[in-house]
Amino acid sequence: MHFRLFITMFAALSGTVATVFSQTSDETEWENVLETLLSDEDLSSDAREELSFMYESMHESPLNINTATREELSQLPFLTFKQIEDIHAYIYMHGPMLSLGELQLTGNLDYETRKMLRLFVYAGDVPVKRQKLRLAEVLRDGHNEIVGRMDIPLYLRDGYRYHSPEELERYPNRAYLGNRLSHSIRYSFNWHNRIRFGISADKDAGEPFFKRNCTGYDFWSPYLYVKDIGLIKELAIGNFKVQFGYGLLLGGGFSIGKSMALSSIDRNNQGLKPHSSTQEYGYLRGAGVAFGRGHTTFTMLASYTPIDATLKGDTVIGSFKEDGFHRTELEWSKKNNTSLRTIATNVRYSYRGLRYGVTFLAEKLSLPYKGHGGFMGFSTDFSLHRPRYALAAEFSVLDGNVAVLASQTFRFQNGWTMNSVFRSYSPDYMSLHTNAMAEGSVQNETGLLMGLTHDSRNLKMSGYIDLFMHPEPKYGASERSNGMDLRAEADWKLGRRDNLYATARFKSKQKDCSYTGQLEYCITGRYRLRWTHNCRNGAELKTQLYYARYDFIAEPISNGWTLTQSYSKSFLNDCLDIDVTAAAFYTDTYDSRISVYESGLRYSYNFISLYGKGTRIAATIRCNLGRGLQLSLKAGGICYLDRDEISSAQQRIASNHKEDISVQFISKF
C-alpha cells in the first residue's frame, strides 16, 4: 500500500512538473487537440462540424477513467486497442487510479497521448454498486448547460437588399425570406452520462423567424437518451443516430476520412446516440431501444423522419437536399417535402475481444428515388481484437447490391503498426445512412488502403497509399477509371517548448478531358508545415505554411500558398483567453484552395477555405465569469486583392472585403 501511494505521488508530481514546463492554457491545449482530431483532409464540412460537436460534448462531460468501458474509450481515435487494454489491466491489477498521473505507469501511453486523454477523462471514485435511479437525486446531481450563439455579419448580401414587388413577382427567389442574423440555442442535461435529454434550435442566415411558422426557429432537435437502466442498455427517443457494423448499412450520418479509417474503422461506436447538434441531416426521428443480457445486445428502432428533396414533377425525388437552408421561396418549398420511414433491428454478441453482429433494415420513402420506393437489406459484421493484431469486416446486401469492407491491424514490438482496409461497393449499392470510408461515394468502387505508423518518444510518423478503381462510369468519368492517393505525416517534439509537424499528400485520379477526348490523370498535391512554440510566459505561437498544386492536361497548372501566424495566451488565472490568427493567401484558382483551422467558439465548425489573393485575420476572446458562466466573442475579416465583389447571385457582396462577429454565451449549473 505504501509503495502504491509512493508511486502515485511520484506520478502526480511528474505530471505537475510536465504541466509547469509546458505552460499551455487549457483552452489552447484543447484547441490544439481539436485541430489534430479534425485534420483529416477527406472529412466534409458537415462531418467536421458533427465530429467537432461530438468531441466538444465528450470534453465537457468527461469519462471516469476507473469505470469507462472499452466501447466508451474507443470513441477516442488517438487511443489504440492495446492502450485501452493496458489501462484496464493496470486498474484491474492495482485498483482505481487516484490521479491521472498514473496514466504514465500503464506502459504504452506516451506524453502526447496522455496529454490528449486528460481532456476527456478524470480519475473518480468507483461506486460499490451501480446507483439506483431516484428522480430527486438525478435532478440534483445532474449537470445543466445552456448555450446561446449569434452570428452578426457586418456586410450586406444581395439577397437582403430591397427588391420591388414587381421584381419579386417575376423573380421570387432573388430575396431571402429572413434577416441576415444566424442564431441558435441549446439546452442539455447530463446525469453521469446515463441520462441525457435536451433540445436544440437553429436559424440560419436568411431564414424567416416567426414569419413562416409559429415555432420561430427553422430547425428543432429534441432528444432523450437513457443508458444502463436494468435490462435496458440504451434508450433513445426523439432525434437520434445509430451505428451498427462499420457504416455500410446504418452509419452515423457522415463519411469518415482515410486517416480516420486506418485508426478507428475497427472500433466505430456501436448502438444508439442522441442527436443533440443543429445538423439538419443524417439523423432519425422516432425511438430506439437496446436490451442487454450477458454478452448479447438486441436493438430495435422505428422512425419517421421528414427530409428535404428536389422533386421532378412533384412525383419523383431527383436528389436529396442536405444543406438545411430554407432562405428563398424555392428552398422553402423543399422543406420537409419528403419523408422516410425506417425500421431496423440488430443483434450483437461481444466476448473477450470478439464481436459479432447482424442488422436488418427496411425503409420506405414517401416518393420514389432512382426507381426505388424503399429499401430492404441486411448486414453482418465481426471484429477480433488481440494485443498485437485486430481483424474487422462487414458484409452488406441492400436490394440485391453488395458492399464489403474488411480491415486488419498488426502491431509490432518496435513501435510500428501496419493497417490495411479493403472495400468493394457494387455500382448500384445505395444506403441513405452509410458513413463508410470511400474515395467518392459508397458505391461503384473497389480499393485497397494500406498504412504504416511508427511511434517513438519524440517522433511520430505515419503514411498510407490508397489504390482505387471505379468499375462503371461516374460523374466526371464517362468510363471505367482508377486512381492513387499517397499521404505522409511526421510530428517531431523538439525539446520541451517546440514542436514541428509536416504533412504531404499526392493524389492522381482519372477524369474526362475535352482536350484529348479520353480519360486523363488529374494530379493534386497538398503540403503543410507547422511550427509550434510555447513561450515562458504561457503564450503559444504557431506558424504554418501551406502549399497546394493542381495539374490537369486540359487546364493551366494552379498553385496556392498560405502563410498563417497564430498567438494564444491566457490571463487572470485562465479567466481570460485570447486567440489571434492572421493569414496571407495566394492561390491561382479554386482548385488550389487551402483549408485552414481557426480557433473559434465552442460546438462550432472552425475550418475556413481560402482561395484567390488576400488576407484574413480573426480573434477570439473567452471570458470565464464564474459560477459556470462563459462569454465568448469572435471577430473576423477577410480582404481580397483580386476582385471587387465576393460570391454571386443572392450571396453577392458588393465589396472586396467582409467582416463578421460571433457571440456565444454558456451557462452551466
Across the structure, where does each feature detected by a protein language model lie?
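Exposed, low-structure sequence patches enriched in small/polar residues
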Residues: 176-180, 284, 302, 338-669
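Amphipathic, charged-and-aliphatic alpha-helical interface segments
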Residues: 48-98, 117-122, 203
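Outer membrane beta-barrel
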Residues: 214-307, 412, 417-432, 575-589
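Transmembrane beta-strand segments of Gram-negative outer membrane beta-barrel proteins
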Residues: 134-171, 189, 193-199, 235, ...
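N-terminal, intrinsically disordered low-complexity tails/presequences enriched in Lys/Ser/Pro
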Residues: 21-62, 127-141
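Outer-membrane beta-barrel proteins
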Residues: 202-219, 273-280, 396-398, 548-555
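Bacterial Sec-dependent N-terminal signal peptides
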Residues: 1-26, 669
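Outer-membrane beta-barrel biogenesis signature
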Residues: 26-33, 111-115, 119, 123-146, ...
